[in-house]
Amino acid sequence: MLERTYIEDVTPDDDGEDTTIAGHVHELRDLGGILFVIVRDATGRLQVVAKEDDTPDLFETAEGLSSEDVVQVTGTLEASDQAPGGVELAPTELTVVSEATDVPSIEISKDVDADLSTRLDERHLDVRKPSTKAVFSLRSKAMGAMTDWFYDNRFEEVDTPELSTAGAEGGADLFPVVYYDKEAYLSQSPQLYKQILVASGVDRLFEVGHAFRAEDFGTSRHVSEIAMFDVELGYVEDHHDVMDVQEESLRHTIRHVVEHAQRELDELGSDLSVPEADFPRITFEEAREILADEYDHVPEDDNDLDTKGERLLGEYFEEQGHPAVFVVGYPDEKFYYRQDVDGDDVASRKFDLLYRGQELSSGGQREHDIERLTAKMREQGVEPENFEFYLDAFRYGVPPHGGYGLGIDRLIQQLAGLDNIKEAILFPRDPDRLEP
């Protein structure tokens, strides 16, 4: 390994210390006899000050540098009020590790916006921009914190197939794949496998994986390949137990980001605070009443909210100090595995979590009685015979259970304050993009 200190670990308190850094040449400024070289690594930027009178050979090497060359620099740290971050490096050794042979097609060192399509085409360059790199550093810290919360609370991580003979949610938005001599599809959701595992005795589980939706869309909220954080737990009394888990884990995640990713938040200009108060839990009917009474907005679909409705509900509750809100009791007409509310022919124990005006997750209590489950499948036009691998798990005693699937990409979009979900994904996939 090349000897180096990460730039984020360098502080003015290190004045007088010798150190070595390595990274890309972010910016060059020649003042005649003094050359300022801003070096950028994965954690930050540090100013290197080369002086012709002090180190003529090194200065000559520095004069030959180009933007994005990879360098290794050894020298003495000097505290300076004029330097970015209050400290700079007086170099004694400068090695060019790798030369940049082409001029980058994207401006990396300056705050100049390229259109999103160009940024995604040149993602290997775009990720070098500090603002883009901050998104994925934040994402890494957020998902590490969320995963840790589930490990600490006795959940087990599982892996389920991303190839299957049928989709958990049915419909036409499945990607068919060639699988030997059989018909197969990319996974819409690990839902059926999560329930099979709960029935098998793995009663607190989570999975970080991908789901695929063959939908033709053109919005800032959708992509074809989705990163998901799926959760399922057994022995629940009702869907509120599931919401409790999601609320506590999300609050922990946001707190970790606020405490450990402030550099990234500052780079992104995202003003993030921890939602300490309980997340409000309102019924689906109450949500529609708020939209009608406060905003004169009525979603066209009587059984769902629309994008505008979610945004308006976000504004309504953020004004009251609640960036997150659960909407509970959606009409039960789409998914056979969701449990109905006793004595109510319409509502289900389904919920959505809205955060900063966007749906992050859907979840609820599942149906664990095989007779009711089979009847609901037939009511919704699903042939139970095609899901025998799933139904067989319910013949041997299944605890009441529930869970949810959280869209990781949407969560990062909201934490980072991004306009488009594709900005939160390293290599997004949509109907028009299959590379890089």
Swiss-Prot record:
The keyword Cytoplasm applies. The gene is aspS. This is Aspartate--tRNA(Asp/Asn) ligase. The misacylated aspartate-tRNA(Asn) is not used in protein synthesis until it is converted by GatCAB into asparaginyl-tRNA(Asn). Pfam families: tRNA-synt_2, tRNA_anti-codon. HAMAP family: Asp_tRNA_synth_type2. It comes from Halobacterium salinarum (strain ATCC 700922 / JCM 11081 / NRC-1) (Halobacterium halobium). Aspartyl-tRNA synthetase with relaxed tRNA specificity since it is able to aspartylate not only its cognate tRNA(Asp) but also tRNA(Asn). This indicates that it is not able to differentiate between base C36 in the tRNA(Asp) anticodon (GUC) from base U36 in the tRNA(Asn) (anticodon GUU). Reaction proceeds in two steps: L-aspartate is first activated by ATP to form Asp-AMP and then transferred to the acceptor end of tRNA(Asp/Asn). It comes from the Archaea. Binds 3 Mg(2+) cations per subunit. The strongest magnesium site (Mg1) is bound to the beta- and gamma-phosphates of ATP and four water molecules complete its coordination sphere. InterPro entries: Aa-tRNA-synt_II, aa-tRNA-synth_II, aa-tRNA-synth_II/BPL/LPL, Asp-tRNA_synthase_2, Asp/Asn-tRNA-synth_IIb, NA-bd_OB-fold, NA-bd_OB_tRNA. GO terms for cellular component: aminoacyl-tRNA synthetase multienzyme complex; cytosol. Gene3D superfamilies: Bira Bifunctional Protein, Domain 2 (3.30.930.10), Nucleic acid-binding proteins (2.40.50.140).
